[in-house]
């Protein structure tokens, strides 16, 4: 359970991050990763953050239906749409304050200009069907298709903000990257003389940091490839090369081809009009998946089920131990 004065452990994570930097920054090269439990269900925030966000909500003239008096402190899984949205917004704000603490700590140690900072997310927003909001239809993860667990852009396109030495302030870069690029990037930036394993999927982003859109990423994989990432979603493989993204439904064999530069919403399927592009990208994707023994749809599904069974058994064993300890 989360401490009542520290919902989602946001406050202690902020403090621990700042304390680590004050203790270590400037003495030797360091790496720190802060992974919050927020934003994620259950929605939680402090009473102070809720009231602050509620005030802005009302001042903005937003829907106050269901804005009932709350007794929880902190606010936990509130009822009513307005309360849920306010709690979620307050939770995100409390999480984002980690950046303030991190930047302040780096500034105090004199290492702010000598440190790479990466702000990103592990997946896209939660998938939600179209809903009627304020008299209109809104897709809550729009304008992107689908969301978390999906290989459509709504599931894999995430915010990524990077600052550090050699990166031009206020610049925007459209070179596609993927999070498994970070390991070879950190290895490259650290100046390590040891080598990475030969078949690491990602590539260093050093040239992208320095040259922006003119930078290139050299990877072992011939593009950015995803292969059946979620066992309870339709089995799909995808590959992104340049502006184009090809998706193949592993059961039906259906192809979807999108030009992400002109159609990031993935609304216009170009597969029928560009058969040669489909063939070229599909052969590259299949060849790589075969090379790394990615498996068939059924093999991947069974591997996921086996893993879930393992997690389930761990939970059962844990509860049994707790019961035995209580007795």
Over which residues does each language-model region extend?
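Active-site-proximal cap/lid insertion segments
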Residues: 1-180, 189-200, 248-251, 261-266, ...
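Short, surface-exposed beta-strand/loop micro-motifs that present aromatic residues
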Residues: 20-22, 235-248, 256
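Short Gly/Pro-enriched turn/cap motifs at secondary-structure boundaries
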Residues: 148-153, 226-230, 236-237
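Glycine/proline-rich active-site loop of Rossmann-fold NAD(P)-dependent oxidoreductases
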Residues: 195, 217-218
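Acidic, glycine-rich loop-and-strand cores that form catalytic or ligand-binding grooves
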Residues: 207-217
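Bilobed periplasmic-binding protein-like "clamshell/Venus-flytrap" ligand-binding domains
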Residues: 218-221, 282-301
